[in-house]
Swiss-Prot record:
It comes from Rickettsia bellii (strain OSU 85-389). Catalyzes the transfer of endogenously produced octanoic acid from octanoyl-acyl-carrier-protein onto the lipoyl domains of lipoate-dependent enzymes. Lipoyl-ACP can also act as a substrate although octanoyl-ACP is likely to be the physiological substrate. SUPFAM superfamilies: Class II aaRS and biotin synthetases. GO terms for cellular component: cytoplasm. The record marks K140 as: Lowers pKa of active site Cys. This is Octanoyltransferase. Its main location: cytoplasm. Substrate binds at R69, G70, G71, K72, F73, T74, F75, H76, A143, I144, G145, G156, I157, A158. One of its GO terms (molecular function) is lipoyl(octanoyl) transferase activity. PANTHER family: LIPOYLTRANSFERASE 2, MITOCHONDRIAL-RELATED, OCTANOYLTRANSFERASE. It is an enzyme of class 2 (transferase). Belongs to the LipB family. The gene is lipB. In the reaction, the free carboxyl group of octanoic acid is attached via an amide linkage to the epsilon-amino group of a specific lysine residue of lipoyl domains of lipoate-dependent enzymes. The active site is at C174.
């Protein structure tokens, strides 16, 4: 059974990376069960393996960390739920297919948002989860960037709950120029992080049996 582990206070990105990589090694060695970490980071810009330096516009004294996950620049900070599924795709009940895994992550988040009346969707060739705001313009509500080691997944998803969206102005999010970002709060949904986590766990079980 996959266990959900919540870090109750905001955590430094580097500290969470060490925690995550240590747990990945334990799963690979058969010393720990699969898990989903739920965290909230201190303000940080992270760059994936496909980043371009010109996509960092102005870091405004926010730390910048270059990571091994897929994707480009994104922001993590207060009011954002970051989800790190550490799953073993080599297990008999899973599939060694990274594209399928990402599609399952997308479905999980889309279904979770639907509980709140938010109709989210994916856009071809644009990684992440999108919604249409009042002006009918696509806005990203969740970013996805994953990595796999010996078929054990790590890194994951960042969903904007009550995030200060102005912090995204320092980057070109995910390398998509002129793209907009949004949050549950901006869409009129106000919910405690712990309540959102409960929905995530319920919907996770439906997708990752």
């Amino acid at each position: 059974m996959v266990q959900f582990i919540t870090i109750p206070t905001p955590i430094d990105y580097q500290d969470s990376l060490m925690l995550m990589e240590d747990y990945v090694n334990k799963v690979i060695d058969g010393e720990a069960p699969e898990a989903v970490y739920l965290v909230e980071h201190l303000d940080v810009y992270t760059a994936g393996t496909n980043y371009k330096q010109e996509e960092l516009l102005n870091h405004n004294n926010i730390p910048v960390i270059y990571t091994g996950r897929g994707g480009k620049f994104t922001f993590h900070g207060a009011g954002q739920r970051v989800i790190y599924p550490i799953l073993n795709l080599a297990l008999p009940n899973r599939t060694k297919d990274l594209k399928l895994y990402v599609r399952m992550l997308e479905e999980w988040i889309i279904n979770s948002l639907d509980i709140f009346g938010i109709k989210a969707y994916i856009i071809k060739n644009k990684v992440g989860i999108w919604v249409k705001t009042n002006d009918d313009i696509p806005s990203k509500i969740a970013a996805i960037g994953v990595r796999v080691r010996k078929w054990v997944t790590y890194h994951g998803i960042a969903i904007n709950i009550s995030t200060d969206l102005s912090k995204f102005n320092g980057i070109i999010p995910c390398g998509l120029e002129n793209s907009l970002v949004t949050s549950l709060n901006q869409l009129g949904v106000y919910i405690e992080m712990t309540e959102f986590d409960k929905i995530l766990e319920v919907e996770f079980i439906k997708i990752f049996k």
